[in-house]
């Protein structure tokens, strides 16, 4: 799990002068950081797996739906474990269409995609299932992502990213070797974004403790 899944990666968009976009970073990872020789179709699927643009291939369109399905169900499970929501709070209209459990929701959406896309040259969902999925996503925004408790945690996480960003901006020689060697070609701020964006939430938290907290407090 890296920062685009866990910590508020949009903070980097505020910090980095050229802006930071998750899908563009995903493409940079395979093109630059990993130096992979991928096909145009694969790269198109990566850069269009999020956002409003549609991938050019059926495979890429499937990935985009799969990402949305996994995202909303994963976050519901996490929110329930954290005590932020309960099953009874999920919108009845969504439950009636998608089901009551994570397994049933995933099965409904995947089956609907298969049925709705059969014999077509585009991957799609039926209107009712698509609406239920987006209504569920909106519910998560209203009750989890923007809720006070989650927002407070996001503020804390954002502060960690800022501290790390500015620290390494002033101490580039402390970057791992695989990032230091990129400084001259890509520039300090770009490389620091690469480093932070690849961190897991646990790694970022531990790095913050290592750099800023006395050993007895970390």
Give the label of every model feature segment.
Residues 2-7:
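Short, small-residue-biased leader/transition segments that mark boundaries at the very start
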Residues 10-16:
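Active-/binding-site microenvironments in catalytic and ligand-binding cores
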Residues 20-218:
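Histidine-centered, transition-metal-coordinating active-site segments
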């Amino acid at each position: 799990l890296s920062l685009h899944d866990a910590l508020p990666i949009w903070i980097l968009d505020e910090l980095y002068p050229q802006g930071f976009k998750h899908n563009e970073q995903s493409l940079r990872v395979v093109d630059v950081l990993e130096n992979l020789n991928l096909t145009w179709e694969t790269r198109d699927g990566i850069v269009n797996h999020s956002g409003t643009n549609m991938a050019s291939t059926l495979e890429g369109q499937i990935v985009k739906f799969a990402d949305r399905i996994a995202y909303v169900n994963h976050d519901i499970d996490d929110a329930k474990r954290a005590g932020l929501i309960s099953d009874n709070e999920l919108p009845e209209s969504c439950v009636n269409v998608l089901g009551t459990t994570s397994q049933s929701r995933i099965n409904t959406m995947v089956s609907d995609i298969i049925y709705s896309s059969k014999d077509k040259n585009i991957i799609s969902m039926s209107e009712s299932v698509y609406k239920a999925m987006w209504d569920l996503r909106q519910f998560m925004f209203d009750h989890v992502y923007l809720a006070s408790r989650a927002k407070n945690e996001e503020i804390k996480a954002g502060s960690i990213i800022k501290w790390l960003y500015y620290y390494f901006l002033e101490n580039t020689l402390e970057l791992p070797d695989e990032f230091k060697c990129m400084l001259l070609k890509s520039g300090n701020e770009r490389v620091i974004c690469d480093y932070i964006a690849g961190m897991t939430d646990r790694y970022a938290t531990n790095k913050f403790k290592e750099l800023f907290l006395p050993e007895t407090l970390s």
